[in-house]
UniProtKB/Swiss-Prot annotation:
<dbReference type="GO" id="GO:0016655">
    <property type="term" value="F:oxidoreductase activity, acting on NAD(P)H, quinone or similar compound as acceptor"/>
</dbReference>
<comment type="similarity">
    <text>Belongs to the NqrDE/RnfAE family.</text>
</comment>
<feature type="transmembrane region" description="Helical">
    <location>
        <begin position="184"/>
        <end position="204"/>
    </location>
</feature>
<keyword id="KW-0830">Ubiquinone</keyword>
<keyword id="KW-1278">Translocase</keyword>
<comment type="subunit">
    <text>Composed of six subunits; NqrA, NqrB, NqrC, NqrD, NqrE and NqrF.</text>
</comment>
<feature type="transmembrane region" description="Helical">
    <location>
        <begin position="12"/>
        <end position="32"/>
    </location>
</feature>
<keyword id="KW-0406">Ion transport</keyword>
<keyword id="KW-1133">Transmembrane helix</keyword>
<dbReference type="GO" id="GO:0022904">
    <property type="term" value="P:respiratory electron transport chain"/>
</dbReference>
<dbReference type="GO" id="GO:0009276">
    <property type="term" value="C:Gram-negative-bacterium-type cell wall"/>
</dbReference>
<keyword id="KW-0915">Sodium</keyword>
<dbReference type="InterPro" id="IPR010967">
    <property type="entry name" value="NqrE"/>
</dbReference>
<dbReference type="GO" id="GO:0006814">
    <property type="term" value="P:sodium ion transport"/>
</dbReference>
<keyword id="KW-0739">Sodium transport</keyword>
<dbReference type="Pfam" id="PF02508">
    <property type="entry name" value="Rnf-Nqr"/>
</dbReference>
<keyword id="KW-1003">Cell membrane</keyword>
Length: 206
């Protein structure tokens, strides 16, 4: 069991990295990766959100939305009820609620990070990496334990990628980059090279 969870975690971090394998969450990934401090802060926020939302959405799917999930209520005909069509709406609602709570927490206790992240903190709500993790969980039929590990791994992988990109971009400020590639141009090339590097993990077998 431990080996299975370890394999799932490593796979989520390196082999199926949300940012560098699936290119999810690119908006905030590119916008907040100019400074390492901001990148780490947003990365931690994404880890927290993913670690909580994926298993919570798993519980919602298991006990409310999937066909026959409402049998525990004892209602007549509950075994035939299928609310899975509400999945997308439910997942987004959970993500939005958690991000709102996180935003209030940072505003109260870590105002410097809250101001540094600015508009990109509430944008975590529509970060497709967050929703994508929940949809992958559904597609792959993960149980609750696997959902916790996968959510944490996906968050750590995204945080690792944005922190690494931020470190490279800080170094690029002191490099002689051609004028036509300055800004997002060289950033896209950097992300592509990082993605190629992470592809080398695809052969890992645990």
């Amino acid at each position: 069991m431990f080996e299975h969870y370890l394999s799932l975690f490593v796979k989520a971090v390196f082999v199926e990295n949300m940012a560098l394998a699936f290119f999810l969450g690119m908006c905030t990934f590119l916008a907040v990766s100019k400074k390492i401090s901001s990148a780490i802060g947003l990365g931690i926020a994404v880890v927290v959100v993913l670690t909580i939302t994926v298993p919570v959405n798993n519980l919602i799917l298991t006990y409310l939305l999937s066909e026959g999930a409402l049998t525990w209520t004892g209602l007549e005909g509950a075994s035939n009820i299928d609310l899975s069509f509400l999945g997308l709406l439910s997942y987004i609602g959970v993500i939005a609620a958690l991000v709102q709570i996180l935003e209030m927490f940072l505003d109260k206790f870590v105002p410097a990070l809250y101001n540094a992240l600015g508009v990109f903190l509430p944008l975590i709500t529509v970060n497709c990496a967050i929703l994508g993790a929940s949809l992958f969980m559904v597609e792959r039929s993960y149980d609750f334990g696997e959902s916790v590990i996968y959510g944490a791994g996906a968050g750590v992988g995204w945080a690792l990628a944005i922190t690494a990109l931020a470190g490279i971009r800080e170094k690029l400020k002191y490099s002689d980059v051609p004028a036509s590639l300055q800004g997002l141009g060289i950033t896209f090339i950097t992300v592509g090279l990082m993605s190629l590097g992470f592809m080398s993990f695809s052969g890992i077998q645990l």
